[in-house]
Amino acid sequence: NNLEDFVQETDICITHGHVDHLFFIPEILEQADATVFATRAVMNTLEGWVEDTGCLVEVEPGYSWRQGNMRITVLKGKHTSFCAKTVFRKLLNPRLLRYFRNALFLAWAHPRFPEKGETAAYQIEAEGKRILLLGSMELDPDTVYPENADLLILPYQGKENMAEAAMEIVERLKPARILLDHFDDAFPPVSEEVDTRPFKKAMDERHPEIKVVKPKAGKPVTL
C-alpha cells in the first residue's frame, strides 16, 4: 500500500504501538484530516512525533464510538511473544546479514515504539454485521470476546506453529469467515513471509463451513 491509500480516511484505529503500526502515522496525518484512536502507550509515542495532538484520542477497553453507520468498540487484546526457538532461528538466519541495516533500524526503533502490554482489539458493528479485528495472534485469557462474528481479521505472524495457534483462536471465537493479515514480510529480518497453506488445509478439514481469505496487496476484498 501507498500513503495515498489512507489519506481519505477519517478514523484510524491503532491496535498497538510497535513501529510497523505507527511509523507512517505522522506522515498520514500531515496529509489527512483524520482522528487516531489508540491506547495511552501509543499516545505517549505519537505525542513526541505528531505536531497537532488534537487529532489523537486515547481509548481503553470498553470505549465505544460511532463513525457513520458503524459502531466501534475497544476490547483488550494481547500481543504474541517470540519463543526462544523463534528468536534463535531468526538470529542464526542468513537473512540477518542480508537485512542488517533493517535490523539496526528495528533495534533502534523497538524501545522507542513500545507495546507496554496495551494491545487492543476492535469490534466493528454495521448493517447487522459484526467484525472482530485482532492486533496480534493472541487472545487475552480474561477477556470475553464476541463469538460467531461475521468476520475475524486475524494477524498471521509471530508463532512457531502458526496453524495450531490460529486454530486455537478459531475454536474459541467461532467466526463465520476469516480474513488473514500480517502474513507478509513487511519488516525483515524480524518478519517473514508466512506460508498460510497449512492453516487453510486444517480449516478445510476441521471447519469447511468457515471461509478463509488471504488478501492480495492493492486488491480490494468484498465481504
Each language-model region and where it sits:
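Binuclear metal-ion centers of metallo-dependent hydrolases, dominated by the metallo-beta-lactamase
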Residues: 35, 49-64, 146, 167, ...
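Active-site environment of divalent metal-dependent phosphoester hydrolases
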Residues: 18-23, 43-46, 63-65, 81-82, ...
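Structured loop/turn residues at beta-strand edges in well-structured enzyme cores
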Residues: 7-8, 30, 51, 68-70, ...
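Active-site-proximal loop/helix segments of hydrolase catalytic cores
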Residues: 107-171
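Active-site neighborhood of phospho(di)ester-bond hydrolases with catalytic His/Asp-centered motifs
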Residues: 9-18, 37-40, 132-136, 152-157, ...
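Conserved catalytic scaffold of divalent metal-dependent phosphoesterases
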Residues: 60-63, 69-82, 137-139, 149-155
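Beta-strand-turn-beta hairpins that frame and shape the catalytic cleft
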Residues: 64-73, 125-131, 222-223
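Pre-active-site segment of Zn-dependent metallo-hydrolases
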Residues: 1-18, 23-30, 48, 81-108, ...
